[in-house]
């Protein structure tokens, strides 16, 4: 197959993915003699199109599974999507609201049909994006969290945990979204610093002797106060414990109680307790058997318990209440105060801690098992390892999980209430006399079904399902470090509880994709990047390679168009090297013609040695998920060694008369390029398939080609050492030419003084490389040479490289030129130094600008030192 003259990603990628899918290349072989390898995709939400974070996440998964497929594993990369309860419902409701329709106008059944329509529309977009990224997914196994099979798994888990007493229904403080009117999980609450106030109020003692000072940021909740607590070790309040105060406005008598929760140093050291509107207060209330008084309704408006404030919005109530307290001279002071306030991720509403009857999971027994498992041979390995400590800490500090949501889109809770007796029935199927029962209207938290993802997607609860037996446990989970607790931990404890095995062997955690300046990408900042736009401009291979190699595990990634463009340049370099090679290999050269047993040149032996070292490095680093290091190893070998050196060196035999030497060079070019394509394939699937199809090869597709392995017979360490010496000499000559302003096209005398006879003979044996790359008018190589008085000498491993300067340059003129350049560099250094010593600039300028100036400073300093050194050398 002929390669086009220019690399065009659109041309290269067009139709290729459809070809892979239609030929079934991504389906597991199901060959029982092979070891199975499985990754299930972290299911994207069907709320919208995929962002750069998804592209990063799935690219890493695809790299791993493509590599494992090539290494001979029976590989399954399973696709799927998440119904994303509150997020999708909010999107569908917003769409309906544009038409002036609410979900209640439609009713549950019709609303759910709208949600399913939304799901189908966005699932199509997501599949199109997966295709553009080139993900090797087996679509015949695609799953959705509301599929029948997964719904069955959800019901079984709920019922089993309920029967074990781990799931229960009760009153607890939950995150309440008054706009969406539903409970929220902790991950659906975004904490933002808000400018508010600390209100200091007087709570008069019931006996009329003074008051106790209470501070709060939420005055509206004081209407639900049921006690005051102080620390029993606080000397200020020892005499008032057991007394009572009068709750302002309401007039209710509140006891003063002792509780060690209170921080003596914070505020006045006395704290109001509102058990129905604060999680910590609720715990205190439980310890002291306090009444729970709810003062708001589900809309965030004050209810009957709020007396004259009934019907007011909670924040309007706050303002009015403070005004009324001022009139009663009960306000001591109001301080400005910045504090963290929870907002609903979906609706943006300020979240209200709210006492509500919900369904909960007791987390302690499940978390303990997950912790204990980390001390067994079945432990899960975290990459980077530091995240295991994060996981353990969260498991140790875990609280019960609110799993019910006041939504329609999701898994409806499999609990029914008897119409007459109120009896609760929990079962995988509805009661037989269904006419006497009403099903709980709430649905389960999205994370409840997501927690079952690694095994529910493979056929569980049918433990005899072929896929479950073959592909579970999965091998690796790749996801962001921000959801270790919300998703990773839950999959671990549910996997252990219901399958008695870890759900995955490894957890590879990456960070967040940030803008170039380090800020988080967001719609409000307008700095988001659509991965599909990047692919349209630079191709999927460029984006994939950048995402995979741009950071190390566990770290954030700064998106940079410049860096994506540099990957495009790298691919273009590979394309041109492949075209050159193919032109020299010739159309008639077949894979059977590859013969490395002939007379290999020094360059051949060197590149084959470096190829084997690179194969070893890439394989080893990939097993540790160190793809940033893999990227560097591949780039250095391909760009610096294969393209810049070997391709150029191969021109010597290819332009010569020795046919057998030409044939050997063709073999080496073909062999090395084949291995390069295979190593690059997981990162750059499209361009490598195109180039590989043009090379002499066996097999239908590179997707199923064998991963390269080290061939000890093709490692020539002595030749590698010799080539390193030659390359150092050539680089030294070229650098010296630059320093004395002499182009490579001008032939000049070159002297090489070697350390010993062996090196001398080695260099003499390979003198053709020195002639080609140094362009000497006269080349002297010896252990003893007379170094001219005026000469430029560089020390290298092999000895010394000397360039006589007599007649080469006008010394005085060159020194004058360099001194002028030195003055310019000094001016630039002074300017940068002045800028960086300016406190105003350093404190106010963006980090990116400061770093740019520091880089300039380093660059100018290095150039200054180099020019100064050249002047001194010339003067000497």
From Swiss-Prot:
Q: What gene name does this entry carry?
A: valS
Which keywords fit this entry according to its UniProt record? Aminoacyl-tRNA synthetase, ATP-binding, Coiled coil, Cytoplasm, Ligase, Nucleotide-binding, Protein biosynthesis
- Subunit structure as annotated in this protein's UniProt entry: Monomer.
User: Which compartments is it annotated to reside in?
Assistant: Cytoplasm
Spell out the family assignment given in the record's similarity comment. Belongs to the class-I aminoacyl-tRNA synthetase family. ValS type 1 subfamily.
Motif, 'KMSKS' region: chain positions: 520-524
Catalytic activity reads: tRNA(Val) + L-valine + ATP = L-valyl-tRNA(Val) + AMP + diphosphate
EC number, UniProt record: 6.1.1.9
Extent of motif 'HIGH' region = 44-54
Membrane-crossing residues? Answer: none
Residue ranges that the Swiss-Prot or TrEMBL entry lists as coiled coil: 805-876
Q: Which PANTHER family match?
A: VALINE--TRNA LIGASE, CHLOROPLASTIC_MITOCHONDRIAL 2, VALYL-TRNA SYNTHETASES
> Which residues hold ATP?
523
Q: Which GO terms describe its molecular function?
A: aminoacyl-tRNA deacylase activity; ATP binding; valine-tRNA ligase activity
UniProt enzyme class? ligase
- State the name under which the record lists this protein: Valine--tRNA ligase
Quoted from the entry, the domain comment is:
ValRS has two distinct active sites: one for aminoacylation and one for editing. The misactivated threonine is translocated from the active site to the editing site. The C-terminal coiled-coil domain is crucial for aminoacylation activity.
Q: One GO BP annotation here?
A: valyl-tRNA aminoacylation
Gene Ontology CC annotation, any one = cytosol
Q: Which organism is it from?
A: Staphylococcus epidermidis (strain ATCC 35984 / DSM 28319 / BCRC 17069 / CCUG 31568 / BM 3577 / RP62A)
| A Pfam family annotated for this UniProt entry | Val_tRNA-synt_C
Q: Give the matching InterPro entries.
A: aa-tRNA-synth_I_CS, aa-tRNA-synth_Ia, Anticodon_Ia_Val, M/V/L/I-tRNA-synth_anticd-bd, Rossmann-like_a/b/a_fold, tRNA-bd_arm, tRNAsynth_Ia_anticodon-bd, Val-tRNA_synth_C_sf
Give the function comment from the record: Catalyzes the attachment of valine to tRNA(Val). As ValRS can inadvertently accommodate and process structurally similar amino acids such as threonine, to avoid such errors, it has a 'posttransfer' editing activity that hydrolyzes mischarged Thr-tRNA(Val) in a tRNA-dependent manner.
């Amino acid at each position: 197959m002929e390669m086009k003259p220019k690399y065009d990603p659109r041309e290269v990628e067009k139709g290729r993915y459809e070809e892979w899918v239609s030929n079934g290349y991504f389906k597991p072989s199901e060959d029982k003699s092979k070891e199975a390898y499985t990754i299930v995709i972290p299911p994207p939400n069907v709320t919208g199109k995929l962002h750069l974070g998804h592209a990063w996440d799935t690219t890493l998964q695809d790299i791993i599974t493509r590599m494992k497929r090539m290494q001979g594993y029976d590989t399954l990369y399973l696709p799927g999507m998440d119904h994303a309860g509150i997020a999708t419902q909010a999107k569908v409701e917003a769409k309906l609201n544009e038409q002036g329709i609410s979900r209640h106008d439609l009713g549950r059944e019709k609303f759910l049909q709208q949600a399913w329509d939304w799901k189908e529309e966005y699932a199509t977009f997501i599949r199109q994006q997966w295709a553009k990224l080139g993900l090797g997914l087996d679509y015949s196994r695609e799953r959705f969290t509301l599929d029948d099979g997964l719904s069955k798994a959800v019901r079984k888990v709920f019922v089993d945990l309920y029967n074990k007493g781990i799931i229960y229904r009760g009153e607890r403080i939950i995150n309440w979204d008054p706009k969406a009117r539903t409970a929220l999980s902790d991950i659906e609450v975004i904490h933002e610093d808000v400018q508010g106030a600390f209100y200091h109020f007087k709570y008069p003692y019931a006996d009329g002797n003074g008051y106790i000072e209470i501070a709060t940021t939420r005055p509206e909740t004081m209407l639900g106060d049921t006690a005051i607590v102080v620390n029993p070790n606080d000397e200020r309040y020892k005499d008032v414990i057991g007394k009572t105060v009068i709750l302002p406005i309401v007039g209710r008598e509140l006891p003063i109680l002792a509780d060690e929760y209170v921080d003596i140093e914070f505020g006045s050291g006395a704290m109001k307790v509102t058990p129905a509107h604060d999680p910590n207060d609720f715990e205190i209330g439980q310890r002291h058997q306090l009444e729970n008084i709810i003062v708001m309704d589900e809309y965030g408006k004050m209810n009957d318990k709020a007396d004259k404030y009934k019907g007011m919005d909670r924040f309007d109530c706050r303002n009015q209440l403070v005004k009324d307290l001022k009139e009663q001279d009960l306000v001591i002071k109001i301080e400005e105060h910045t504090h963290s306030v929870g907002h609903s991720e979906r609706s943006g509403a300020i979240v209200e801690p709210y006492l509500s009857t919900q369904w909960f999971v007791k987390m302690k027994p499940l978390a303990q098992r997950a912790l204990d498992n980390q001390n067994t041979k079945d432990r899960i390995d975290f990459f980077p390892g530091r995240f295991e400590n994060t996981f353990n800490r969260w498991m140790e500090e875990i609280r019960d999980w609110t799993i019910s949501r006041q939504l329609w889109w999701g898994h409806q809770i499999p609990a029914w209430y008897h119409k007459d007796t109120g009896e609760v029935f929990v079962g995988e199927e509805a009661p037989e006399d269904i006419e006497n029962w009403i099903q709980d209207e709430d649905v389960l938290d999205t994370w409840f079904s997501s927690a079952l993802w690694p095994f529910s997607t493979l056929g569980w609860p049918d433990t005899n399902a072929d896929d479950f037996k073959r592909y579970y446990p999965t091998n690796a989970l790749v996801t962001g470090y921000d959801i270790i607790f919300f998703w990773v931990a839950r999959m671990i404890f549910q996997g252990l509880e219901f399958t008695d095995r870890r759900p995955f062997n490894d957890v590879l955690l990456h960070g967040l994709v940030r803008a170039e300046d380090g800020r988080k990408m967001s719609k409000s900042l307008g700095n988001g990047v659509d991965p599909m736009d990047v692919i349209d401009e630079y191709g999927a291979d460029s984006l994939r390679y950048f995402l995979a190699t741009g950071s190390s595990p566990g770290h954030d990634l700064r998106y940079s168009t410049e860096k994506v463009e540099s990957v495009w340049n790298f691919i273009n370099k590979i394309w041109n090297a492949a075209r050159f090679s193919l032109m020299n290999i010739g159309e008639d050269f077949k894979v059977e013609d590859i013969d490395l047993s002939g007379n290999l040149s020094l360059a051949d032996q060197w590149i084959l040695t470096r190829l084997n070292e690179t194969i070893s490095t890439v394989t080893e680093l990939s097993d540790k998920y160190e793809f940033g290091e893999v990227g560097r190893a591949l780039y250095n070998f391909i760009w610096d060694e294969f393209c810049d050196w070997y391709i150029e060196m191969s021109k010597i035999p290819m332009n010569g008369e020795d046919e057998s030497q030409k044939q050997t060079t063709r073999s080496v070019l073909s062999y090395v390029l084949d291995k390069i394509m295979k190593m690059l394939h997981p990162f750059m699937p499209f361009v490598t398939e195109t180039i590989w199809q043009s090379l002499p090869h066996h097999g239908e597709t590179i997707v199923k080609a064998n991963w390269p392995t080290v061939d000890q017979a093709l490692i020539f360490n002595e030749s590698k050492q010799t080539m390193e010496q030659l390359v150092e000499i050539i680089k030294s000559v070229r650098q010296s030419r630059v320093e004395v302003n002499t182009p490579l096209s001008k032939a000049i005398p070159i002297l090489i003084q070697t350390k010993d006879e062996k090196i001398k003979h080695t260099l003499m044996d390979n003198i053709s490389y020195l002639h080609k790359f140094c362009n000497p008018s006269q080349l002297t190589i010896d252990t003893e040479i007379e170094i001219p008085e005026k000469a430029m000498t560089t020390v290298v491993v092999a000895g010394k490289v000397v360039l006589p300067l007599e007649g080469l340059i006008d010394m005085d003129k060159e020194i004058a030129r360099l001194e002028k350049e030195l003055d310019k560099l000094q001016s630039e250094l002074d300017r940068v130094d002045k800028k960086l010593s300016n406190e105003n600039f350093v404190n106010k300028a963006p980090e990116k600008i400061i770093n740019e100036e520091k880089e300039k400073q380093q660059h100018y300093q290095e150039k200054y030192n180099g020019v100064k050194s050249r002047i001194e050398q010339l003067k000497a």
